[in-house]
Amino acid sequence: MSLNRNEKEAVVAQVSAQVAKAQTLALAEYRGLTVEHLNALRKQAREKGVYLHVLKNTLARRAVAGTSFEVAAGSMAGPLIYGFSEDAVAAAKVIADFAKGNDKLVIKAGAYAGKALDAEGVKALASIPSKEVLLSQLLGLMQSPVSRIARVLAALAEQRGGSAEAAPAEAAAA
């Protein structure tokens, strides 16, 4: 079923709105996927905040024209599903994780920070931990020296025969 001009303009406007908010674009060929598999992929994408859309490639090229994702326009050929995400790694991660379990979904290309990515680049981007994981790792690194100092002070207080609360006061007096 073909779309008339107004419907095409509406689709391009809708996708352009998602593109404007996105940091990452991931393209994958879905040839041979069943409807059930596509629905499962869409469900996973919704849970991760990824906008997935099957588009005509010409409409996708129009939607990304003038954006940082225009560099991926050369890769837009064949039956593709487009994944856009505000999180830097979410789109790549959702598509790569699904492709691991289903050989019919083939990662083709992507774009991040104005640079075109090949399939290996998208897989590398997908292997980066999410922002939340990176922040928790950073917090753990920052808390590690503080907790070590607290343990040393507690051990020092035990050696001197005092309480753990007295150790910081003694250390400050010294």
From Swiss-Prot:
GO molecular function, a single term: large ribosomal subunit rRNA binding
Keyword Ribosomal protein listed: yes
One BP annotation, GO: translation
InterPro entries per the UniProt record, alphabetical: Ribosomal_uL10 (IPR001790), Ribosomal_uL10-like_sf (IPR043141), Ribosomal_uL10_bac (IPR022973), Ribosomal_uL10_bac_type (IPR047865)
Chain segments annotated as transmembrane: none
Highest taxon listed in the record's lineage: Bacteria
Keywords (A to Z) from UniProt: Ribonucleoprotein, Ribosomal protein, RNA-binding, rRNA-binding
GO cellular component: ribonucleoprotein complex; ribosome
SUPFAM superfamilies according to UniProt: Ribosomal protein L10-like
Similarity comment: family membership: Belongs to the universal ribosomal protein uL10 family.
Self-association and partners: Part of the ribosomal stalk of the 50S ribosomal subunit. The N-terminus interacts with L11 and the large rRNA to form the base of the stalk. The C-terminus forms an elongated spine to which L12 dimers bind in a sequential fashion forming a multimeric L10(L12)X complex.
Protein's job: Forms part of the ribosomal stalk, playing a central role in the interaction of the ribosome with GTP-bound translation factors.
UniProt-listed NCBIfam families: PRK00099.1-1
Protein name from the UniProt record: Large ribosomal subunit protein uL10
